[in-house]
Amino acid sequence: MRIAIDGPAGAGKSTVARILAKKLSFTYLDTGAMYRAVTVLFLENNLSLEDENGIKRLLEKTDIKIIPGDEGQKILLNERDVTELIRTPQVSELVAKVSALPEVRKYLTELQRKIIAKGNVVADGRDIGTVVMPEAEVKIFLTASAEERARRRHRELLAKGYEVSYEEVFREVLKRDELDTTREISPLRKAEDAILVDTTGLKIEEVVAKLLEIIGRKNDVL
């Protein structure tokens, strides 16, 4: 079975998808982490978003691996562990623009489909149900109010030791929403056959329970 979970930043996709995959003994594919890993390369190489040839050369020698583990997945970028680095504010600020680049989306979509082809998978991102895995048996679109999503992100950053105000995070969430929904290539949108789940005010375990119920109903039909 293939389960696609899409939604805007801060909706809880990664946390919920990771828990679901563990409960179902499925592979977990965090596509957002892959885009963040590529963004690290842009920052470290001072690569311009307009440098098409430079981007192609960079991607040709880029290797991204997702290594599952009991404490969560590790992201290896050219054999280097960047699991923590990809969650920094600098990466968060640039990732939407990097994600909108056609060369980057093509490269990562192909890589994601290779992982998906291996078997039972829970994949989360912004275009899983519409582009990467449109044939998924279960499609979920997670959302929440912008205020709720900003609060979650703010708590996460504070817990990691970053000094940032809620107002800054809220503005960043709104900016990310605009970039994700208006980009020319694979914009964020709900697939026609996806089930909408609003996570505003819900605890993680409540969201997971809702999704397990949806998956169970779908499984009965298949």
Curated annotation (Swiss-Prot):
One of its GO terms (cellular component) is cytosol. Its main location: cytoplasm. InterPro entries: Cytidylate_kin, Cytidylate_kinase_dom, P-loop_NTPase. Keywords: ATP-binding, Cytoplasm, Kinase, Nucleotide-binding, Transferase. ATP binds at G7, P8, A9, G10, A11, G12, K13, S14, T15. The keyword Nucleotide-binding applies. It catalyses: CMP + ATP = CDP + ADP; dCMP + ATP = dCDP + ADP. The keyword Cytoplasm applies. GO terms for molecular function: ATP binding; CMP kinase activity; dCMP kinase activity. SUPFAM superfamilies: P-loop containing nucleoside triphosphate hydrolases. It is an enzyme of class 2 (transferase). Transmembrane segments: none annotated. Its EC number is 2.7.4.25. GO terms for biological process: nucleobase-containing small molecule interconversion; pyrimidine nucleotide metabolic process. It comes from the Bacteria. This is Cytidylate kinase. It comes from Carboxydothermus hydrogenoformans (strain ATCC BAA-161 / DSM 6008 / Z-2901).
